[in-house]
């Protein structure tokens, strides 16, 4: 049988064998095509795990099978059947084996002659390469538009009207096309281009001109080749995106003068398109966020934050940044050459036990993240739910507590929803799908995908991939979490308003026990019996707590903390919790931690954002007597929601940090780590601790009790610390020396109880701001950002090569001012950044600078 099929000279046998080979080639090529489509279905490596060589083999193998093997064998089969004769290149009697190897040699020669497939390094932001044409071509500069990636699998897009692969757009540096096709292109586009321009660079490079990276998903390669197919010539760009390759380096001051600080027309258009609109499709986001002005504003926002002087995985901070770096950063983002480095993963203890992973990113990359965050905030903030308060402008934990007080005072059940590892379990593909609903900018989405897949480095310096979740601690993570969980907010709004809430407040059912006791009181003749019945009735509400004809539910969310107030039954609460869990699993790929999520009666209360939230029991509510006819009746007041500060927990935290002892008793004690500081520093430290606690809990119902307890602990702890510092032994001697308010004789700083008086009034400003408000804010911030780079060196007066010197903190100690001249000058100016030239900056870090004499 084998000899018949492999060595037969019968035309019919060979035709059948060719037909079988054509079918097999078509099936194998289709399978390869499906694998390629799945791999390119989304940004980043999908199923091949970054194996670029395997991807190249699949692309070339698919091309060979679908272009050569399948159609050639099928055509040969038809010829054999029609003429019933074996046709061979060498002889009519030549067998199949010779013919097979002949065609294989032809295919192999064409692959090596016309196809060049290269393997690139695989990393966190790399997806491998593709087969690229290597023919001699001409250089055509590219700028301003997106080019489709040239693949052997999508050459039918323009001629057939559909593509065999997803449309992936990217940014390239140079496109290479055949000379005759360039003539056709320039003729169609009415561009007058000289012959010398077409042939530029072809002679020196033998026609094999290369760019610096692939356009595919914005991942840079190593000297990759990009070939534009003839069908897609009308989409080639005309100007170079990297003008710095052929341009001399500009002086920083000359560049700064070209920055327009007043024209924000594109940004204004983006704001107006998204102001109170939830279905706007946004494009060109990457170009806007990579604008040097937006990067300057982003830098101005993050430059003074303490965490931005913490080193990431590459030990680079904001120190030494200059306008040239921001200019290069802008170009790298715009050309998709920018990559996020892995974050440094640290673990911090949680109050409930265990550890929370925290990501420490590269401070300079936070400039890019802040610019991304500003774009996302402009697009999404006005469409967020009214009940969402986390990480939004003009909103905070306190506004969330106020909303609880306004809406949940009549609820009889509270549901505390605990999302299971919220930040760490957000699926990347679902997050990308949510963003794609309103953002149609592949460059921006690729940049975001690079951030999500950048990975992290643990404490042992081992690299780990990230395929799930968003890094806690990054600048853009909070708003990404809000965007993702906004689906949950909209679901709860729709469920409560359209499905759960029923009935009218005026038609609420009366409590039968209350009505029965009221009737007995009315019929009772003895005063003593009547008083007993009245006291018994006080334990019951007039209206039914769980009335099937009247139900209400409200929720408030701050990031991943959710509280739901329910006017209904306990079974209603269970159903709501199960419905939320099912929605999260089916639509967001998340779940609820059922062990930590609780359903409690409103009298018991739950903990939300550090407050103990509960409702005053009916029998403890105050009442007043009103006259009704000839009789007086007693009417209960409607009290507001009780939001107490957990005083015991706060005292335990002070105990943990050394301000008191004896657990919840809170016996004050001195803090040994402060005795070597100045008296002014000690007083300001205690005042800062007290103000921080009072400021956060200023809405607490038990604020007066809290203030008295905390003031007592901090005041006497401060006295004991000063007693140890000045060796006065007792608190009495400290008060006799410094007075009842502990006045520092030099700075006149005192420990006054009046400093802990916090206003209870809260400014409930609407989070939905207008485009004019944002523009005014940016127009104010941009000149301040430019002033850091457009001044003079504060040491030598130079105007060139200016950099920004950063310090972590400003220490007011006199010895620092004396020992370090530059730091002392920054302390006097009250600035954590100062502009100096590159030469002076080098001397500062080498320890060779100690005054203006240098």
Swiss-Prot record:
One of its GO terms (cellular component) is mitochondrion. It is found in: Mitochondrion. Residues 329-613 form the Reverse transcriptase domain. Pfam families: AI2M-like_HNH, Intron_maturas2, RVT_1. InterPro entries: AI2M-like_HNH, Cyt_c_oxase-like_su1_dom, Cyt_c_oxase-like_su1_sf, Cyt_C_Oxase_1, DNA/RNA_pol_sf, Domain_X, HNH_nuc, RT_dom. This protein is coded in group-II intron 2 of OXI3 (COX1). PANTHER family: COX1/OXI3 INTRON 1 PROTEIN-RELATED, COX1_OXI3 INTRON 1 PROTEIN-RELATED. This is Putative COX1/OXI3 intron 2 protein. The lineage of its organism: Eukaryota, Fungi, Dikarya, Ascomycota, Saccharomycotina.
């Amino acid at each position: 049988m084998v000899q018949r099929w492999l060595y037969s000279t019968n035309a019919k046998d060979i035709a059948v064998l060719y037909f079988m080979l054509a079918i097999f080639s078509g099936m194998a090529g289709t399978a390869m095509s499906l694998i390629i489509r799945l791999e390119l279905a989304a940004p980043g490596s999908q199923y091949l795990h970054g194996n670029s060589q395997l991807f190249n083999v699949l692309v070339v193998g698919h091309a060979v099978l679908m272009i050569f093997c399948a159609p050639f064998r099928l055509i040969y089969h038809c010829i054999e059947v029609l003429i019933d004769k074996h046709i061979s290149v060498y002889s009519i009697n030549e067998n199949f084996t010779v013919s097979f190897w002949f065609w294989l040699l032809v295919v192999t020669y064409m692959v090596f002659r016309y196809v060049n497939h290269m393997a690139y390094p695989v990393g966190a932001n790399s997806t491998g390469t593709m087969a690229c044409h290597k023919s001699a071509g001409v250089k055509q500069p590219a700028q301003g538009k997106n080019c489709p990636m040239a693949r052997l699998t999508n050459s039918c897009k323009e001629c057939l009207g559909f593509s065999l692969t997803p449309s992936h757009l990217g940014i390239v540096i140079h496109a290479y096309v055949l000379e005759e096709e360039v003539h056709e292109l320039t003729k169609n586009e009415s561009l007058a281009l000289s012959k010398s321009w077409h042939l530029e660079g072809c002679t020196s490079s033998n026609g094999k001109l290369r760019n610096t990276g692939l356009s595919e998903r914005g991942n840079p390669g190593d000297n990759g080749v990009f070939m534009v197919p003839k069908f897609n010539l009308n989409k080639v760009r005309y100007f170079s995106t990297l003008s710095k390759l052929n341009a001399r380096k500009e002086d920083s001051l000359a560049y700064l003068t070209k920055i327009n600080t007043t024209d924000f027309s594109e940004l204004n258009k983006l704001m107006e398109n998204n102001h109170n609109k939830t279905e706007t499709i946004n494009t060109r986001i990457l170009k806007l966020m990579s604008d040097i002005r937006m990067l300057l504003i982003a830098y101005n926002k993050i430059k003074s934050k303490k965490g931005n002087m913490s080193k990431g995985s590459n030990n680079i901070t904001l120190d030494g940044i200059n306008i040239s770096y921001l200019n290069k950063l802008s170009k790298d983002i715009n050309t998709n050459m920018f990559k996020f480095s892995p974050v440094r993963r640290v673990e911090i203890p949680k109050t409930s036990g265990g550890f929370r992973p925290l990501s420490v990113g590269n401070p300079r990359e936070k400039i890019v993240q802040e610019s991304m965050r500003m774009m996302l905030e402009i697009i999404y903030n006005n469409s967020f739910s009214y009940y969402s308060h986390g990480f939004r402008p003009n909103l905070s934990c306190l506004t969330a507590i106020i909303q609880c007080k306004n809406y949940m005072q009549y609820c009889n059940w509270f549901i505390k929803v605990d999302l299971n590892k919220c930040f760490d379990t957000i699926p990347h593909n679902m997050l990308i799908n949510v963003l794609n609903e309103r953002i149609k900018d592949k460059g921006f989405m690729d940049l975001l995908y690079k951030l999500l897949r950048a990975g992290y480095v643990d404490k042992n310096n081992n690299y780990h991939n990230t395929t799930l979740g968003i890094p806690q601690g990054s600048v853009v993570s909070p708003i990404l979490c809000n965007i993702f969980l906004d689906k949950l907010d909209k679901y709860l709004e729709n469920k409560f308003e359209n499905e759960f809430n029923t009935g009218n407040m005026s038609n609420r059912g009366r409590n039968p026990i209350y009505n029965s006791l009221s009737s007995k009181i009315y019929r009772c003749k003895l005063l003593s019996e009547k008083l007993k019945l009245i006291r018994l009735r006080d334990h019951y509400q007039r209206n039914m707590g769980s009335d099937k004809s009247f139900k209400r539910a409200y929720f408030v969310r701050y990031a991943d903390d959710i509280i739901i107030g329910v006017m209904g039954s306990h079974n209603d609460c269970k159903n709501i919790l199960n419905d939320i869990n099912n929605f999260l699993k089916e639509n967001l790929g998340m779940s609820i931690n059922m062990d930590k999520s609780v359903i409690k009666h409103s009298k018991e209360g739950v903990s939300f954002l550090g407050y103990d939230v509960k409702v005053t029991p009916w029998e403890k509510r105050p009442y007043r007597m009103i006259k009704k006819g000839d009789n007086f009746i007693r009417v209960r007041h409607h009290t507001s929601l009780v939001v107490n500060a957990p005083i015991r927990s706060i005292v335990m935290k002070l105990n943990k940090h050394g301000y008191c002892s004896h657990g919840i008793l809170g016996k004050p004690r001195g803090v040994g780590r402060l005795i070597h500081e100045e008296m002014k520093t000690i007083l300001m430290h205690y005042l800062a601790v007290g103000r921080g606690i009072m400021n956060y809990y200023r809405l607490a119902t038990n604020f007066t009790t809290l203030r008295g307890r905390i003031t007592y602990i901090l005041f006497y702890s401060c006295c004991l610390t000063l007693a140890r510092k000045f060796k006065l032994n007792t608190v009495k001697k400290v008060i006799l020396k410094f007075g009842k308010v502990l006045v520092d004789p030099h700075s006149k700083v005192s420990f006054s109880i009046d400093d802990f008086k916090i206003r209870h009034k809260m400014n409930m400003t609407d989070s939905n701001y207008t485009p004019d408000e944002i523009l005014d804010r940016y127009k104010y911030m941009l000149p301040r950002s430019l002033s850091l780079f457009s001044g003079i060196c504060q040491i030598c007066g130079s105007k060139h090569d200016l950099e920004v010197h950063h310090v972590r903190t400003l220490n007011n100690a006199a010895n620092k001012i004396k020992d370090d001249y530059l730091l002392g000058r920054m302390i006097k100016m009250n600035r954590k950044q100062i502009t100096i030239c590159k030469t002076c900056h080098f001397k500062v870090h080498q320890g060779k600078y100690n005054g203006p004499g240098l």
